[in-house]
Amino acid sequence: MTLTNVAPLTASEIKQLAADWYLKLDVHAPLEEYIPFLAEEGLEMRFPEATVYGFDGFKGWYERVIGIFFDEVHTLKQVNVQPSADEASVQVIVKWEASVWNRPAAKSQRIILDAYQTWIIKRSLNTGKPVIATYIVDSLSYYEGSAQL
């Protein structure tokens, strides 16, 4: 669908979207705070462990992972934006650090990796703001000494 009379997506607003998204993930923000970031229709999110669709799919994934990972830190390393008519393809590299505790281990373990991702960003049909329509984790590159997923 092509939106008419809508400003083209800009690299600066997409970079801000990415920074805000990862800040929310770091603090395990309440679920409703993610609604403005995600496309109302056609949302697809491909994680290493699952592919989910729509906000309900995201909700199930998010509720699961915030029960597993803690002390998270996301550091944006790269956000490359390639705009087209009514969307933008974005290559994201984010350094992700998180702790995980697996029963009955005496201590938690630290995961440190770079996640290579592809996002498709569109303008919200309701607000006109940029939203994530497609979110794909393409690959993970672990740092030396990191625990593994």
Language model regions located:
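A short hydrophobic beta-strand element
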Residues: 86-101, 115
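Short beta-strand edge/turn micro-motifs at domain boundaries
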Residues: 2, 109-149
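Short, cysteine-centered beta-strand-loop-beta hairpins and adjacent loop/turn segments enriched
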Residues: 67-71, 97-112, 142-145
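Short beta-strand segments enriched in hydrophobic/aromatic residues
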Residues: 38, 94-98, 136-138
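A short, structured loop/turn motif at beta-sheet edges
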Residues: 79-91, 120-131
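Short, low-complexity N-terminal intrinsically disordered segments enriched in polar/charged residues
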Residues: 1-41
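A broad structural signal for short, well-ordered beta-strand segments within beta-sheet-rich domains
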Residues: 13-14, 69-71, 76-78, 129-138
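A solvent-exposed, acidic/Ser-Thr-rich amphipathic alpha-helical stretch
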Residues: 31-83
